[in-house]
Design a protein with these regions (language model features):
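Active-site microenvironment of metallo-dependent hydrolases
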Residues: 25, 72-172
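His/Asp/Glu-enriched, well-ordered alpha-helical/loop segment
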Residues: 5-109, 126
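Charged helix-capping and loop-helix junction motifs
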Residues: 2-6, 118-120
């Protein structure tokens, strides 16, 4: 089934999104997870039976986009994640005294063309989001111009692939 996300949020249920790597999200891309949550919430609404309102037939597919907007989904990935971790007092938003955890994305790319002109925040979920150009974690730059600054990714990726292959072989 599809989680009744809007109903749960309206009832005050704390909900957050996150990624922890290949075990649960092969891309380890939080924007992809936020987009998926948004689309599933919209599909869930679209599956509702038509109803009559003010003498007019209303279909769920007409209401889906308003049920979960890109900003709603981004809130789940930021403030929502901080809330469910019990850290809303220090994470989840750009605010004085909070951890400086920030990801920055270019909006002048082909994948963002058109969408970012009208709504750059929404375009992060509605367009094909690239990897972050800059990422700051607790005030420290860890990605600069799309490249990790804290580790050499080549050996890490090679080791990761070796372990994934070994795991698959062991499971066979």
């Amino acid at each position: 089934g599809i989680l009744p996300l809007r109903k749960m949020l309206d009832a005050g249920v704390p909900i957050g999104l996150g990624v922890d790597g290949s075990a649960s999200n092969d891309a380890a891309h939080l924007l992809n997870e936020a987009r998926q949550a948004m689309l599933l919430a919209r599909v869930g609404k679209a599956l509702e039976a038509p109803r009559i309102e003010n003498g007019r037939t209303v279909f769920g597919c007409d209401l889906g986009p308003s049920d979960m907007t890109p900003r709603d989904a981004l809130r789940l990935a930021t403030r929502g994640g901080a809330q469910v971790l019990g850290r809303a007092h220090e994470l989840g938003q750009i605010k004085e005294g909070y951890c400086a955890d920030i990801a920055m994305f270019r909006t002048d790319t082909l994948s963002m063309a058109g969408g970012a002109v009208h709504d750059p925040v929404g375009a992060l979920l509605l367009c094909a989001s690239d990897n972050a150009d800059y990422t700051i974690v607790n005030g420290r730059v860890v990605v600069r111009e799309g490249k990790m600054t804290t580790v050499d990714m080549g050996p890490m990726i090679e080791r990761h692939n070796q372990l994934a292959l070994q795991l698959a072989l062991d499971a066979a």
